[in-house]
Amino acid sequence: RLGDGAGSGKVVAPENSLTPENDLAAEKVVAAENGAQSLTLQYLRGERPRYSRSKRTPNYFIKVEGAMEHNLKDIDVAFPLNTLTVVTGVSGSGKSSLVGDILYRAMFRHLNETGEAPGTFRALSGSLDRISQVEYVDQNPIGRSSRSNAVTYLKIYDDIRKLLSEQPYAKMNGYGPAHFSFNQEGGRCPECQGDGFVRIGMQFMADVTMTCEACGGKRFKPDILEVRYRGCNVDDILNMSVSEAIDFFSSDDNPSAQRITARLKTLVDVGLSYIKLGQSSSTLSGGESQRIKLAYYLSMTQNRDSVRPERILFIFDEPTTGLHFYDVEKLLRSFDVLLSKGHSIVVVEHNPDVIRAADWVLDLGPDAGDNGGELVFAGTPEELVAQGNTFTAKYL
């Protein structure tokens, strides 16, 4: 087992621990020798309490009437607003058909009068006027270009370029923010065009990528790399981890540096303190991409001037995929920030910790395929457990 903390890369339990009992025992010994127990061990032994949310009571709903897409059996489903609603059920019970194919597409068409046709249903009703935007936060890459990364997606790089352009050497040579862009001619390496690598086409094999010989993988011209902000050039900054960059920028009172720090902290909030600022989006996992998108919306809530008056309906499809127990806590805290701003969240999820933390549960079933497609429960997690006759209830 690896730990302790994101980006550490330390082995805290040996690979020859073949049983759960041995694994836990070995990990405890190793962790004790290091002066602390690993987070994994604390969660598995029940020594660390699960995150406890302040539950919200639903007052307004959006109702999907007559949902009949795929195996859905003409069901009416009410989705609460300004709450964390978790849609549960065994695989194949109809969750994605209901939430992705019907709710999301129907809401998008209602709000934008365009978009992909929703799945089969009769009507959309309820407090539709209380939602002015719908966002499906999926695990698709955050950008199609190899030059896209977390700081470009969160608009952090704009302030980084501005800071660099304000340095004496940059002013002396007439370098503006555009000279520190990957996407514009001027400062980027002309050989690799800001990628830091070149791609060599192979006729009968996959293309090969090699570090750009002209810039040595640094992406920019030598003169641009001479510009330094607090001793670091643009390449140094892009190679910092999120946590390193927060330490670096937070001690500067410059408004741009403070904005950078605030937005970087949203990446920490979603468990991404370890990624490099300039790390290409093509190297990020689907779960990491999804959490960067969540961080973007969290950053919108920081500055009142940037927060639009809309109340957004956020839809997530299994956001805990690949997450440690500790990261699930961070995810739930991030959800609470969005809810506190008046937004609404619907999550398709199997993770018991998320289901327990929900304000409202919509359980589909009772089984999969032709034996699924029914709404077998709607209510709080506590009511679901008390009812006790669905697969989800039994596992909770």
Task: Annotate each PLM feature.
Residues R1-L396:
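Conserved phosphate-binding elements of NTP-dependent enzyme cores
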